[in-house]
Amino acid sequence: MTTITDIAKAAGVSIATVSRILNYDTTLAVTPETRQRVLKTAEKLAYKPRRRKRVSPQTTVALIQWRSEQEELNDLYYLQIQYAIEARAASAGYHLQSLHLEQLAAETTQNVQGVIALGKYDAGEVATIKALAQPVVFVDQNMLAFDCDSVTSDYAGPIEQIIHHFQSVGINDIGFLGGVETSRSGREQFQDVRTAAFDRVMHAENLMQPAFRFIGAFTPDSGYELMKQAITKLGDTLPHGFIVANDTMAVGALRALNEAKIEVPQRVSVISFNDVAVAKFTTPPLSTVHAATDQMGQTAVELLQARIKDPKRIPRQVNFKSELIMRASSL
C-alpha cells in the first residue's frame, strides 16, 4: 500500500506538505505546480497497471478530455481512468493524443483512427467528436443512443447499499452532499445518478428529508461550504449519516465538521464515492465506494480495438460494479 512517505519521496516534498495537500488544506502556501505534482504522484503510485508486452505505436488514438487540468485535480476520479487508458493504449501499440474538447481543430488531429472520450457531452459535442474520427468509445456516459460503445460505473446500487448500511447501525436521518455537472458548451445539465438514486431510495424507505439534501459542485471547497451550511442550518438536527458524492467533496466536508468540533464517526458518519488516493489519508480515513477505474480505462481501449477491427460490430455498454470500502469515517 502506498504511504505518505512514498508520495513525499517521489514528489520531492516533505511528508507534512503531502498530508496537507492531500487534505486540500487551503491555508498551505505552495505553488500550483507543487500541488499538482503531489496529487498526480499520489494517483500514479496508487495505480498498479497489469504487466503487458508493449509494442511500437502504430495507430493514433485521440483521448478527449472534458475537464481542465485544474478541474481534474478537484475530482481525481477522471485522472485515475486516464492513467489506465494511457497504460493500456501503450501496451496495445496506440499513440495516444490527449486533447481537450476545445482543441478539436483539424490541424491538431490529423491521422486519428479512433477516439476515446472521457467525461460527459451534449448532443452537439458528440457530433463534433464523431466527426473527428470513428469509432468512438465514451467513458462515464452511456452513449448507445448515439451508436457508440460506452464504459460506465454503477453508482445507483451502492447508494442503496449505503442507506441500508446506515439503517442497520440505527442511522435513519441521512443527509446528502451532491453536485451538478454541465456540458462544456453549457447547453445541457446532466442528472447525477447518485442524486437520483438517493432521492428514489430515501422516498421508498420513507426517510426522505429535503432539508438534509445539499447540492453544489464536485470540489473540496463545495463540500466544505455545503457541510458548513448543513451545520449552521440544522444545528442539533444535523443528520447522523451523510452520503457525499465524491471523495474530494468529502475532504472538504470533514474539514467543516472538524472546525465545528463535530466528531466523525461518533456524531456524524461519512461515506463518499470513488476511492481516490486521498481517501486513505484523510482524518479519519474515508469510507468510500471504490469505482473500477482501472478496469474502466482498460476496457475502453479494448472496446476501441474491437471496433477498429470490426466496424460493423454492434455497440455495447459495459457497466462496472462498484464496491463499498469501509474505513474509519463511518460506523
From Swiss-Prot:
DNA-binding region of this protein: 4-23
Annotated pathway: Carbohydrate metabolism; galactose metabolism [regulation]
Species, as recorded: Lacticaseibacillus casei (Lactobacillus casei)
Coiled-coil intervals: none
Physiological role: Repressor of the galactose operon. Binds galactose as an inducer.
GO BP term, pick one: galactose metabolic process
Gene3D superfamilies noted in UniProt: 3.40.50.2300, lambda repressor-like DNA-binding domains (1.10.260.40)
Keywords tagged on the record: Carbohydrate metabolism, DNA-binding, Galactose metabolism, Repressor, Transcription, Transcription regulation
Protein's name in the database: HTH-type transcriptional regulator GalR
Gene Ontology MF terms in the entry: DNA-binding transcription factor activity; transcription cis-regulatory region binding
Gene: galR
InterPro entries, A to Z: HTH_LacI, LacI/GalR-like_sensor, Lambda_DNA-bd_dom_sf, Peripla_BP_I
Protein's UniProt keywords contain Transcription regulation: yes
